């Protein structure tokens, strides 16, 4: 039987730490959370490799190196409320739940929502929930959010989601600029002013369902 604990630590040592991730709580959450539980079948055998793994319904488990870079960029803290957009089977939601006071994962696909909910229960995570809804609208019921993570590349930044940031809030999203350029972008809000900066460049699979969403302009 595979030693997932050792594989998990190797992922942290070989993919996360060399990428200059220094957020101690994040490093601990990555080392403790059973990533293999969020995929099925033979995918468990390479879930700790540095690749994006298909979950079904055009959703992917983002590779640990990129995922950790996005979450570190958010600077999550224990008082924060987090939104995980395109949560898939709930891995990102589970990680955010260990870094924040509360985490909400939103997903359009009912089967994935069911899997995410079951896994959060199985892992005894009581400060997180997976809900079903259109991704482009975020989840206004629990807004505003201190941190928002988008688990997939978007062609542009969706206005409805950005507007759900709290004062001082941060949003991490990979923007597909075209011609192979993918920018991991941090968006910040201070009162009614918004800013953005590029964290790093890395390709991730696209998150469908945003083509008709109103676009946020800075």
Outline where the language-model segments fall:
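Class I SAM-dependent transferase core
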Residues: 1-83, 91-95, 99, 112-122, ...
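Conserved nucleotide-cofactor-binding alpha/beta core module
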Residues: 75-195
């Amino acid at each position: 039987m595979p030693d997932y604990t050792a594989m998990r630590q190797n992922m942290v040592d070989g993919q996360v730490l060399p990428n200059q991730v220094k957020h101690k709580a994040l490093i601990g959450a990555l080392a403790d959370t059973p990533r293999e539980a969020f995929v099925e079948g033979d995918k468990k055998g390479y879930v700790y490799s540095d690749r994006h793994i298909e979950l079904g319904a055009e959703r992917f488990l983002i590779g640990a190196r990129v995922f950790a870079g996005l979450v570190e960029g958010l600077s999550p803290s224990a008082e924060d409320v987090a939104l995980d957009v395109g949560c898939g089977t709930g891995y990102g939601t589970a990680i955010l739940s260990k870094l924040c006071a509360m985490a909400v994962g939103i997903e359009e696909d009912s089967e994935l929502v069911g899997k995410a909910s079951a896994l959060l229960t199985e892992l005894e995570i009581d400060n997180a929930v997976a809900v079903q809804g259109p991704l482009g609208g975020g989840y206004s019921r629990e807004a505003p959010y201190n941190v928002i993570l988008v688990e997939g590349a978007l062609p542009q930044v969706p206005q409805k989601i950005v507007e759900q940031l709290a004062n001082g809030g941060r949003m991490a999203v990979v923007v597909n600029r075209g011609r192979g350029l993918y920018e991991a972008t941090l968006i910040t809000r201070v009162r009614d002013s918004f800013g953005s900066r590029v964290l790093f460049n890395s390709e991730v699979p696209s998150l469908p369902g945003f083509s008709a969403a109103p676009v946020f302009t800075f």
